[in-house]
């Protein structure tokens, strides 16, 4: 039943991602009943497939820590992407201590404890983080995109990721936090490269 559920949710995610560049990222979140995030009131997935949600809030000190990542102005789009990776990792650590996902392992490698997130949940949670950065004017060079999907490729399972667009060029990048365990920097590579089967371990 779990496999059927994952396949169904992946199919729905794929449907929602058709024409992803023309869709607001909130559309992906709305499928899981995740409302537009606020610093003091936001929701994230707390299980694979995003079947369970946690309603959380950042304290003033926590949000100050996140803002500090962007405190000095980014010098280039590439520099901002590096900061985004660090900020997403910082947010994952904070969220993990609040809802038990701190033991989330890399990929789908379960360890028999805590709460494991799959790529569907990771894409949603990272999109929540990115929308908060955008809402709070922390992003200078990028705009949050609709999550992206890649299908069966080179013997690999379907996969989802959050995404961003570079404002001046329109270049499209992943912000993929699924490959590594909770609190590690996300993968940020061109979407075309990611769709071709990118894996950081290759």
Where are the regions that the model predicts?
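Bacterial N-terminal signal peptides that target proteins for export
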Residues: 1-8
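C-terminal motif of bacterial Sec signal peptides marking the signal peptidase cleavage site
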Residues: 16-18
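Bacterial signal peptide processing site
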Residues: 20-23
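Post-signal peptide N-terminal segment of mature Sec-exported envelope proteins
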Residues: 26-53
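Acidic/histidine-rich, surface-exposed loop or edge segments in extracytoplasmic proteins
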Residues: 46-78, 104-112
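Mid-length scaffold segments of soluble, non-membrane domains
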Residues: 79-142
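Hydrophobic/aromatic-rich core segments of domains that either
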Residues: 131-194
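Low-complexity, Gly/Ser/Thr/Pro-rich intrinsically disordered linker/tail segments
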Residues: 194-202
């Amino acid at each position: 039943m779990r496999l059927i559920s994952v396949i169904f949710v992946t199919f729905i995610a794929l449907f929602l991602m058709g024409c992803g560049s023309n869709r607001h990222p909130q559309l992906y979140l709305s499928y899981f009943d995740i409302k537009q995030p606020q610093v003091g009131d936001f929701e994230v997935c707390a299980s694979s497939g995003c079947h369970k949600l946690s309603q959380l809030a950042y304290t003033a000190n926590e949000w100050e820590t996140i803002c500090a990542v962007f405190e000095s102005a980014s010098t280039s789009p590439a520099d901002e992407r590096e900061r985004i990776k660090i900020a997403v990792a910082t947010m994952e650590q904070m969220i993990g201590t609040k809802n038990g996902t701190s033991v989330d392992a890399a990929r789908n490698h379960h360890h028999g404890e805590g709460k494991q997130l799959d790529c569907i949940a990771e894409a949603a949670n990272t999109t929540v983080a990115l929308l908060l950065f955008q809402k709070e004017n922390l992003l200078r060079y990028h705009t949050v995109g609709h999550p992206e999907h890649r299908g069966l490729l080179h013997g690999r399972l379907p996969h989802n990721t959050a995404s961003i667009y570079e404002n001046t060029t329109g270049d499209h990048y992943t912000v993929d936090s699924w490959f590594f365990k909770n609190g590690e920097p996300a993968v940020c590579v061109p979407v075309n490269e990611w769709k071709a089967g990118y894996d950081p371990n290759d």
